[in-house]
Amino acid sequence: MTPLLELKDIRRSYPAGDEQVEVLKGISLNIYAGEMVAIVGASGSGKSTLMNILGCLDKATSGTYRVAGQDIATLDADALAQLRREHFGFIFQRYHLLPHLTVEQNVEVPAVYAGLERKQRLLRAQELLQRLGLEDRTEYYPAQLSGGQQQRVSIARALMNGGQVILADEPTGALDSHSGEEVMAILHQLRDRGHTVIIVTHDPQVAAQAERVIEIRDGEIVRNPPAIEKVNVAGGTEPVVNTVSGWRQFVSGFNEALTMAWRALAANKMRTLLTMLGIIIGIASVVSIVVVGDAAKQMVLADIRSIGTNTIDVYPGKDFGDDDPQYQQALKYDDLIAIQKQPWVASATPAVSQNLRLRYNNVDVAASANGVSGDYFNVYGMTFSEGNTFNQEQLNGRAQVVVLDSNTRRQLFPHKADVVGEVILVGNMPARVIGVAEEKQSMFGSSKVLRVWLPYSTMSGRVMGQSWLNSITVRVKEGFDSAEAEQQLTRLLSLRHGKKDFFTWNMDGVLKTVEKTTRTLQLFLTLVAVISLVVGGIGVMNIMLVSVTERTREIGIRMAVGARASDVLQQFLIEAVLVCLVGGALGITLSLLIAFTLQLFLPGWEIGFSPLALLLAFLCSTATGILFGWLPARNAARLDPVDALARE
């Protein structure tokens, strides 16, 4: 008869300083299907090491071990995990149940790694628990069970994927005599069903119940009676689970890993919440700075645009400070007419200015008098608190009318409710007040100079007696490139004058400078927020490393029941990503609250959350989880199952 498990000259040694300590010394052993074998020996004799090799948790240093004719030395880690999953079931002295899972969920774990569908797993687990008398304890947690009940759950878990070979390590060692007898009775039933049962024990009474007792001493077998040949094995072994394959198995495995990750996080709610806190603050900082910063930028740019940033000023001469007399009369009224006809011009206004005295009754103040057209106020986005601007008739007739700014009104008419219709002296010319203009506040501060505006025809003909213009201001239509407009304006006037005796000043440059400055500031603030996100990510990595250390035994249990290294890696990586995603969602919610709160106090701000900002937040959360969860997950996947199971 061909042995199910065949060991030939198995040796296992471990490094101890500069030396190698040999624990198993040339073990040769055959175990046949359906046998109930006890391996006995004193502590330190090597029986546990032998069991680990039999269960494919460990590999021999030398020698040959075959399972159903397959040499395990040729198998990689994943193939060994599959072998454990499909052929072996472990029963541990301390039960090794996962405390955050219910009885039913503990029993299902091996089938999860086998890829069995949820419904089939549930039915199989319920069937096994019913057979072992635990049908009324399926929703209990291990801490709510007695030792005997926990060991029966461990047996059910060992049988979940079929359990062709049952490896029981001191199965009664932590139980009272009655519970121990119940467990041994169950093991006898399994033997009768065709399972191969291998018991590792130091208790002679337990060993005596086996058909064959193998004694090991100092790493060598000192007693190995021949196997009792079995003609017929009653019942046959448990049915091996049928797994799904391909894409469905991948999706099912991922869903189960996600579920297990969620359960693990829920088991330590406070620690999970504190871990999330760093991510919440980081994501909220990034999103808030991006969104609120963009709203602030748009608010600033809107304010700048409202004071005439899409304007081009034309001055005579070569550059600022050029007072060469030959350029003084370069700009004419005909130039203004030609400019106004261009398709890209929204409005254009001339300017003729001089500093004059203003007088009303006994009030005498200095002011800057500016001759402009009626479009001037539209060009600079100015509004009227009283009256209105000049009309064409007043421009054509050189009417003696004037518009005051709010500061001039306050100086000349401190106690009057309505000043429209009042007459003041502008220089020596009487002028009737037709309006009060409200100037937009500039971010660069306001001038202390009082300002009044007259029709440019009045200013040129009646006040100054000149026929040329000091400057022309052009407002470019929305949507038209300001730089292109400046080039066309330069070409137009150069052709008209036959030379370039003027220069331009494009206020769009100010806008671009402000935009660049706000972008730089926003980038700086975003980097600060990203640093907080990185700190949060480091917190996640730290907690996950602690979690791996705390859950080392759990990792060993999962590997013993068939989890591959990739399964462990996936689970811990999903846990890290899940922490970051939930933290990210809460961070986005917090940033929404911050934005809405700001909008209550700053109603002029238009704060909006673009899908791109939310997508970036989601991607940041995922990337943080993957980046900072990789190291802990990799450490977990690299654990040796034997060492992991031995950890307290």
From Swiss-Prot:
Homodimer. Part of the tripartite efflux system MacAB-TolC, which is composed of an inner membrane transporter, MacB, a periplasmic membrane fusion protein, MacA, and an outer membrane component, TolC. The complex forms a large protein conduit and can translocate molecules across both the inner and outer membranes. Interacts with MacA. GO terms for molecular function: ATP binding; ATP hydrolysis activity; transmembrane transporter activity. Residues 5-243 form the ABC transporter domain. Part of the tripartite efflux system MacAB-TolC. MacB is a non-canonical ABC transporter that contains transmembrane domains (TMD), which form a pore in the inner membrane, and an ATP-binding domain (NBD), which is responsible for energy generation. Confers resistance against macrolides. The keyword Disulfide bond does not apply. The chain crosses the membrane at residues 273-293, 523-543, 576-596, 600-620. Belongs to the ABC transporter superfamily. Macrolide exporter (TC 3.A.1.122) family. It comes from the Bacteria. It is a multi-pass membrane protein. This is Macrolide export ATP-binding/permease protein MacB. Its main location: membrane. It is found in: Cell inner membrane. GO terms for cellular component: plasma membrane. ATP binds at residues 41-48. Keywords: Antibiotic resistance, ATP-binding, Cell inner membrane, Cell membrane, Membrane, Nucleotide-binding, Translocase, Transmembrane, Transmembrane helix, Transport. One of its GO terms (biological process) is response to antibiotic. Its EC number is 7.6.2.-. The keyword Transport applies. InterPro entries: AAA+_ATPase, ABC3_permease_C, ABC_transporter-like_ATP-bd, ABC_transporter-like_CS, MacB-like_ATP-bd, MacB_PCD, Macrolide_Exporter_MacB, P-loop_NTPase. It is an enzyme of class 7 (translocase).
